[in-house]
């Protein structure tokens, strides 16, 4: 399946793996790229040299294209932005901030820049800054979210910009991919399903929690102070929401969650850690290789789109 995104990025399938903090490291990124999609290394709050090491390790596992997600609010964002150029990375996705200050440097180095957006206004602004494409991410996704659903956001962004649009949020099988294409997207970004891939280094408890999740198992914390995060319900989210309803300050609530994502991902504490996952978790029932996942999803999507 060829689109402007597959041509631009040099990939076989229009599937991009989300740049998830503590999850999107070199093993996963390389596996997705080897399977024909675009793997991403999640920069998160990591120092530049850590990201550099991840890039080099990924290159030992694949010679296919992969990218880096740069979290712009990270205290290390300046260093990571430079490392991307120094290491010859050709695709960057961005989130949590404005990439404008890095655009000239990245464009001069031939880097394709793809910001994640949660509104039409932001998509237009990113196109004005010179973005090559945008990821329109709905609130069904795991982690930090906006207010619009994927179903409503994607077609509005498609109508508003001339650059390619990648749909994200609530996509975990071929039906979701086909639906995104019918809305005008030219690729999809998938996170939660890849978390449970065999190549993912996430703790087995985390994977099992996603696989056993039901349709109503996700919740959103942080709405009160304008920092909504979608994750799976557990003791930590219940305590957070209770304190939120009691009117606790952002600082008090932030303290409660410090280190909890790492606790869940690396230590397997899915009761007191933050188990970030999208609403699609209820649809995920097994652990597979990235190659199996992508083959299954694309086969289903192509069959459905062939009926149209």
In which residue ranges do the predicted regions lie?
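Active-site entrance/lid segments in N-terminal catalytic domains of soluble metabolic enzymes
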Residues: 1-164
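Residue-level detector of alpha-helix initiation sites
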Residues: 23, 171-172
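Conserved active-site-proximal phosphate/metal-binding subdomains
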Residues: 152-166, 172-308
């Amino acid at each position: 399946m060829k689109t402007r995104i597959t041509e631009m990025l040099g990939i076989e399938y229009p599937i991009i793996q989300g740049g998830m903090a503590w999850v999107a490291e070199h093993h996963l990124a390389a596996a997705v790229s080897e399977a024909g999609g675009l793997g991403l290394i999640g920069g998160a709050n990591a120092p530049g040299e850590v990201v550099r090491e991840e890039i080099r390790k990924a290159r030992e596992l694949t010679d296919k294209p992969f990218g880096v997600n740069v979290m712009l609010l990270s205290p290390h964002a300046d260093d990571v932005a430079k490392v991307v150029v120094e290491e010859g990375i050709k695709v960057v996705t961005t989130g949590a901030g404005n990439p404008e200050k890095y655009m000239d440097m990245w464009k001069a180095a031939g880097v394709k820049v793809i910001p994640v957006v949660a509104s039409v206004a932001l998509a237009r602004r990113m196109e004005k800054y010179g973005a090559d494409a945008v990821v329109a991410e709905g609130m069904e996704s795991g982690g930090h979210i906006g207010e619009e659903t994927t179903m409503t956001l994607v077609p509005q962004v498609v109508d508003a910009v001339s650059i390619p649009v990648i749909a994200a949020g609530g996509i975990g099988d071929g039906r979701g991919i086909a639906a995104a294409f019918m809305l005008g997207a030219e690729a999809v970004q998938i996170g939660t399903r890849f978390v449970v891939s065999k190549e993912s280094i996430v703790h087995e408890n985390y994977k099992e929690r996603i696989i056993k999740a039901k349709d109503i198992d996700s919740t959103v914390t942080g709405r009160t102070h304008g920092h909504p995060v979608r994750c799976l319900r557990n003791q930590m989210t219940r305590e957070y929401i209770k304190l939120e309803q009691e009117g606790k300050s952002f600082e008090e609530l932030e303290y409660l969650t410090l280190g909890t994502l790492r606790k869940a991902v690396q230590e397997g504490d899915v009761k007191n850690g933050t188990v970030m996952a999208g609403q699609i978790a209820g649809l995920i029932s097994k652990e597979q290789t990235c190659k199996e996942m992508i083959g299954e999803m694309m086969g289903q999507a192509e069959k459905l789109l062939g009926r149209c």
